[in-house]
Amino acid sequence: MQVGCHVSISGGIDRSVDNAVERGCTAFQIFSRNPRGWRAKEISKDEAGTFKKKLKESKIEPSGTCVHMPYLPNLASTNDESHKKSVDTLIGEVERCGLLGIPFLVTHLGSHLGAGEEKGIERLVKAYKSAAGVKNGVTILLENTAGQKNSVGSEFGQLGSILSQLRPAKRFGVCLDTCHAFAYGYDLSTRAGAKKSFDEFDKKVGLDNLRVLHLNDAKAGCGSKLDRHYHVGLGSIGKEGMRAAARLASKRGIPMVVETPVDETRDDVGNIKAARALAG
């Protein structure tokens, strides 16, 4: 079972492996650089080598690791300047994943900025097709959104439609965020609701395309369109829904990453333990 959390790269990208080991991770996610800026410091061969050496020594399988895109890029942007910067960042992140030997890059689909879903998706597909030109084995993952205004990729049918336009198909997959799905309106809070939602995901996106699960509970209600993560099993989704998601991932060998708060209620270690217990 591959379970872990998002860990910091503060002090050097190899430190992320140390942070993952300290938390008992068998999977983990990182930002490869400062997520709040456009500029990225290059990863040297020595830095990449140290990261890969530590990862090998840690016994964490590379298949359980992923990089998350920075916050600023908007791949669905209809503003030419912003879109170009976003595409350049996407290409750069695919290259950085390749240097580190990390197989998955998690991407946000972005906002069409009021230009309409059709225009936004057109820009999004163009961005992904550009990134597919990078010659390495990195799989680019599309993460479902919580349904905020002007966002794309919240509804499973739309997510599946976008995915179906991308080639080569083997270069693309999906990262399902349980909090985002719940916030959009998929009621994961009961066993029956979770089954119905995952059946719909399978029909419209395909469980075979699910490569990483963001196992996050929700602070807000179902259909709220609010992206507010909460501790595993303690939020609005609750234990039944989190158990259904965790067991699905465990059964299919899909890495689970928690992106939950660290506060007086629980820390990363506590949420990883909760996820592991629910997965059985």
From Swiss-Prot:
Q: Which GO terms describe its biological process?
A: base-excision repair
- Catalytic class of the enzyme: hydrolase
| Domain of life, source organism | Archaea
The cofactors named for this UniProt entry are:
Zn(2+)
Q: Does the keyword Metal-binding apply?
A: yes
In the record's cofactor note, how is the cofactor described as bound? Binds 3 Zn(2+) ions.
Q: Supply the alphabetized keyword list.
A: DNA damage, DNA repair, Endonuclease, Hydrolase, Metal-binding, Nuclease, Zinc
| E.C. no | 3.1.21.2
Q: Which residues bind Zn(2+) 2?
A: E143, D177, H214, E259
Molecular function (Gene Ontology), one example? DNA binding
- Catalytic reaction equation(s): Endonucleolytic cleavage to 5'-phosphooligonucleotide end-products
Intrachain disulfide bonds:
none
Q: What InterPro entries does its record include?
A: AP_endonuc_2, AP_endonuc_F2_Zn_BS, Xyl_isomerase-like_sf, Xyl_isomerase-like_TIM-brl
* Residues that hold Zn(2+) 1 according to the record: H68, H108, E143
Positions of Zn(2+) 3 binding: H180, D227, H229
Q: Which Gene3D superfamilies match?
A: Divalent-metal-dependent TIM barrel enzymes
State what this protein does: Endonuclease IV plays a role in DNA repair. It cleaves phosphodiester bonds at apurinic or apyrimidinic (AP) sites, generating a 3'-hydroxyl group and a 5'-terminal sugar phosphate.
Q: Which family does it belong to?
A: Belongs to the AP endonuclease 2 family.
Q: What is this protein called?
A: Probable endonuclease 4
Taxonomic classification, please? Answer: Archaea, Nitrososphaerota, Candidatus Cenarchaeales, Candidatus Cenarchaeaceae, Candidatus Cenarchaeum
